[in-house]
A protein has these predicted regions:
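C-terminal subregions of glycosyltransferases and related glycan-biosynthesis enzymes
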Residues: 198, 215-341
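Glycine-rich, basic loop-to-helix element that forms the pyrophosphate-binding segment
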Residues: 74-91
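The conserved acidic donor/metal-binding loop of glycosyltransferases
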Residues: 100-104
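N-proximal low-complexity "stem/linker" segments adjacent to membrane-targeting elements
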Residues: 1-30
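Conserved nucleotide-sugar donor-binding catalytic segment
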Residues: 153-237
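Conserved donor NDP-sugar-binding/catalytic core segment of glycosyltransferases
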Residues: 108-143
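Short aromatic/hydrophobic "clamp" motif used to bind/position activated sugar donors
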Residues: 96
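Acidic donor-binding segment of Leloir-type glycosyltransferases
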Residues: 25-72, 76
Length: 341
C-alpha cells in the first residue's frame, strides 16, 4: 500500500463531457490554493482522446504552480464505484477530494477545506454545502446546505444517521481520508453507484463526517447521468436517464449497506436512513420524474413498494401530484424549493 503524503489530491472520475471537463480544470487552476496533484481516471468513453488532449494541454500549466496532473486511461470500463475506489488507491496524498467531471470548484474551495482538516486531522470524511448551477456558475440556481454551522456527524456525537445520506449523497467536493479509507476497500457494492455512501456509513460509525459551513464547489444540474456502460452497471442502469429500476437499485443498495455496516459496528443506522429515503429524498426523485408518462410513474411506484419505500404519506402525495398534474407539477416543486431556500 502506497503511503499517503501530507496534502491534497483532487480526484476526477472522468467519462465524456469534454467541455465541462476543461471548465473543471480551469476552476481548479483559478483556486486561491491549489492541490498537490490532480488525478484523473478516464473510464473508457468515446471522447477519451479529446479528454486526454485537454489533460496534456493543462499538465504544464499546473506544473508551473507545483501541481502534478496525472491522466490515467483505465484498461476496461470499471464503472463508477470501482473507478472511485481506484482514484483513492492511486492518489498520493492524505486528503482525496472527489469531484464529478461536470462540477466546478469555487475560488476559495480548497483553502476552506484545508483550514478544517488542519483542525480535524483524524476525521474520516468531509462534506460541504454547494452551489447549484446549470450552465453558468455566476447565475446560481440555489444553495444546497444541510446545516447552518460547521459540524461533525457521528454515532458518538449522537447524530441521526439520516445525515449520512444528506451529507454524502452528492459526491462533488466530498473529501476522503485516504489512510482511513484504503483498508476498507471492497468490490461488494460495485454497481450501487454509492461507494461514497459505503464509506460514509463507516465514517459515521468511526471518526465521523465533518461538515463545512461554507460551500467549496458548484454542482451542475441538468446533465443526464452516464452510468450503465460498465459490466457492473449495464444490467440495471441506462446511460442518459435514471430509470425506476435503476433508482430502486440505488436505494436498495443504500439500505443493504446500512444494514451491513450497522451490524459491523453494532449501530442502528438503517432505521433513520430508510426514513430519510422514504420522506425527504423521495421529493428529489419525484421532482426528477415530473412529466414522465403514466407507465413510468407507475413503475417507479411499484419499484419503491418492492423495497418498502412507498409506505409514507409523502411519496404517496408526490406520486399523486405527478400523476394528476403532469408537467404542471413542476410549479409545486419549484415553490417548495423557493420556500426551503
Amino acid at each position: 500500500m502506497k503511503v499517503s503524503l501530507e496534502g491534497f489530491s483532487v480526484a476526477i472520475p472522468a467519462y465524456s463531457r469534454v467541455k465541462e471537463f476543461e471548465e473543471l480544470l480551469v476552476s481548479i487552476y483559478d483556486m486561491s490554493f491549489l492541490p498537490n496533484e490532480i488525478v484523473i481516471c478516464e473510464d473508457g468513453s468515446k471522447e477519451r482522446k479529446e479528454l486526454s488532449a485537454i489533460g496534456s494541454q493543462w499538465k504544464s500549466k499546473f506544473q508551473e504552480k507545483n501541481c502534478n496532473l496525472i491522466f490515467i486511461e483505465n484498461e476496461i470500463n470499471l464503472g463508477y464505484d470501482a473507478n472511485v475506489r481506484k482514484l483513492i488507491e492511486v492518489s498520493s496524498f492524505k486528503w482525496v477530494v472527489l469531484i464529478g467531471n461536470d462540477d466546478l470548484f469555487l475560488k476559495d474551495g480548497l483553502s476552506i477545506l484545508k483550514e478544517f482538516t488542519d483542525r480535524n486531522e483524524n476525521i474520516s470524511m468531509v462534506s460541504r454545502p454547494f452551489i447549484r448551477f446549470s450552465d453558468d456558475i455566476n447565475k446560481p440556481l440555489g444553495f444546497s446546505t444541510i446545516d447552518s454551522k460547521e459540524n461533525i456527524y457521528s454515532n458518538s456525537n449522537k447524530s441521526s444517521s439520516k445525515m449520512i445520506f444528506r451529507s454524502c449523497g452528492f459526491v462533488g467536493g466530498l473529501v476522503i481520508n485516504r489512510n482511513w479509507a484504503l483498508p476498507l476497500a471492497t468490490k461488494k457494492y460495485d454497481g450501487s453507484l454509492y461507494y461514497q455512501i459505503y464509506l460514509a456509513c463507516n465514517a459515521f460509525c468511526t471518526n465521523g463526517i465533518g461538515y463545512l459551513k461554507s460551500p467549496t464547489v458548484g454542482g451542475r444540474t441538468g446533465n443526464p447521468p452516464l452510468f450503465g456502460s460498465a459490466e457492473s452497471e449495464s444490467e440495471i442502469h441506462i446511460p442518459g436517464a435514471y430509470s425506476a429500476k435503476g433508482r430502486a437499485k440505488m436505494w436498495k443498495s443504500v439500505l443493504e449497506i446500512s444494514q451491513d455496516i450497522g451490524t459491523k459496528y453494532k449501530v442502528d443506522i438503517y432505521k433513520d436512513l430508510k426514513k430519510e429515503l422514504m420522506v425527504k429524498q423521495s421529493f428529489h426523485v419525484f421532482e426528477m420524474n415530473v412529466g414522465v408518462g403514466v407507465r413510468e410513474l407507475k413503475e417507479l411506484k411499484s419499484e419503491l413498494k418492492k423495497i418498502e419505500l412507498f409506505n409514507h404519506i409523502v411519496p404517496k402525495f408526490l406520486f399523486t401530484i405527478n400523476y394528476f398534474f403532469g408537467r404542471n407539477a413542476l410549479i409545486f416543486y419549484r415553490l417548495i424549493r423557493k420556500i426551503a431556500q
